[in-house]
Amino acid sequence: MTHYEQRLENDLSQIHTNVATVAGTIQQALKNAVYALLTGDSDLAYSVVLGDLAVNRAMRDIDRQCHAFVAQHQPSAGHLRRISSVLRLEIELERIGDYLASIAREAVQLSETPPDSVRKNIDFLADQVGKVLQNAIESFLDDDPELARTTKNVAYEIERTYESTFADLLNEGEKGTRPLRDLFALLIVFNRLGRIADQSKNICEDTLFTVTGETKQPKVYKVLFVDEKNDCATQIAEAIGHKSFPDSGKFDSAGWNPAENIDPALLGFIERRGHALDSVVASSLMSTAHEISDYHVIVSFGGNVLDHIAAAPFHTIFLNWDIAPGPADLESSNAEKELEDIYNELVRQISNLMLALRGENVD
């Protein structure tokens, strides 16, 4: 190894060591913030807030080291990817530190420690988040892409935990036994823990980019079209989505009171528009195939789908489109024209929706 190569490796090693030190500090701060919240330890809570200032200073030092490394060594390929990832990681760790300071500040505002039901949820969620954060950091420090992929998948599951804990918090609010300020504080705590899980996913993405050059794939959105019968407009919408945006979305349709059969005339119309059909049946909104919380967007035609489900999932967007129900008689002389109007309007609306979700590169 030449003198230049040795100096480059030494500088990289120093950056790696500093990142590991800050990451360890943040992991301990997570434990301290949650413990302070659950026990009412205000001294420990304020130590987390003060500790965040040291984290911010350490992040600025790492930032300076990275820029100096680029200026001195003019890295390329793997070394450049690593420094680029460290700069992103620096932002993610700093944000996590901010979230922990926020949890600590909310802890000292509580009138008393959280009630048992909420306490259990916080403890469980914090444990999940802590493991995900630890594994994400380990994947980065150890250049372990497989651990990064596994951890990403686990992090996605935390969203389901967040929804259940939110429901329990609402139940506590309905009892009226705690001040409204406490409930808002606990809601913020849950939100911050969820955001730490999100940042952990980003750290896993940094690992994959560093080790393999793999970049984050554009998000594929799950869209559900719903009306009463699921025997006309929603079937057309699903077919348009499949054909026009096969790589950007996954599309389904359902009805809250589905028809027994789909008119062959509708199937013929859809096929004449170049949409390949296998087996098309009217699907029930209540079917186990439609887990409402799995969808990013749910679009209802001719009625509000929220009137037909128990609760609106936290992360799902609900839209109402003014789409005609379709001709009463698909064999009538005007049926083709009515279907054509519905089809054209749906093409426009779905295109605008996917453009909003994915931007100009939608496909």
Please place each PLM-identified region on the residue numbering.
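Short polar/charged helix/loop
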Residues: 107, 220-363
